[in-house]
A protein has these predicted regions:
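Hydrophobic alpha-helical bundle signature of multipass membrane enzymes
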Residues: 1-98, 106-127
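Membrane-embedded catalytic cores of phosphoryl/pyrophosphoryl-handling enzymes
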Residues: 86-177
Length: 177
């Protein structure tokens, strides 16, 4: 059947209009863009460390697997970031040019699912504001992260890996204390 060009064009127009709005607001404030980008990185990293070290270490596998799959999807989709169409000076703290899917959104959504703290959801919003991601990148990434979490949980629960890993890790920690 193929892709529906009308839907794709409408979605792109929505993406474009939202990004254009933020570009107009921030185009002369690149220092603010840098600060906002730094905040989004700090929020995501702090939640990852909190989850791994204070909630459950085995979630590290969820983050590693989701990051690897996301990276592969970025290579396959090869979608350009919004700043590419507006102003390349917005390419602050960007290591590659692929927009889809949004790793920040996936990490933030997984962190929200695990902790229930809504504060972490500011990271994907900030990535849209600073022209690092299209709105559709973030929306699809939310769905993708829910799929990652459900798949990870079902695999660990089905095979009983979760409990045996926690017991092993607790013994390892006690042994070296």
């Amino acid at each position: 059947m193929g892709k529906n060009p009308i839907f794709i064009n409408k979605m792109f127009m929505i993406d474009y209009k939202i990004s254009e709005f933020f570009y107009r607001k921030l185009r002369d404030r690149l220092n603010l863009v840098y600060i906002i980008d730094t905040i989004s990185h700090i929020v995501n990293l702090s939640f990852i460390f909190y989850i791994i070290f204070f909630i459950n270490f085995s979630y590290i596998f969820l983050f590693i697997i989701s990051t690897a799959i996301t990276y592969l999807l970025k290579l396959i989709s090869n979608r350009k970031r919004p700043y590419y169409y507006f102003d390349k000076r917005f390419a602050i703290l960007v290591y590659e040019n692929h927009s889809f899917p949004s790793e920040h959104t996936i990490i933030a959504t997984l962190s929200f699912i695990i902790t229930g703290n809504i504060l972490v959801l500011i990271a994907p919003i900030l990535r849209i504001v600073t022209l690092k991601h299209w709105l559709s990148d973030a929306l699809f990434s939310i769905i993708l992260s829910i799929i990652f979490y459900l798949f990870f949980s079902s695999i660990f629960n089905f095979f009983g890996l979760f409990n045996s890993f926690i017991i092993w890790f607790d013994k390892l920690i006690i042994k070296y204390e």
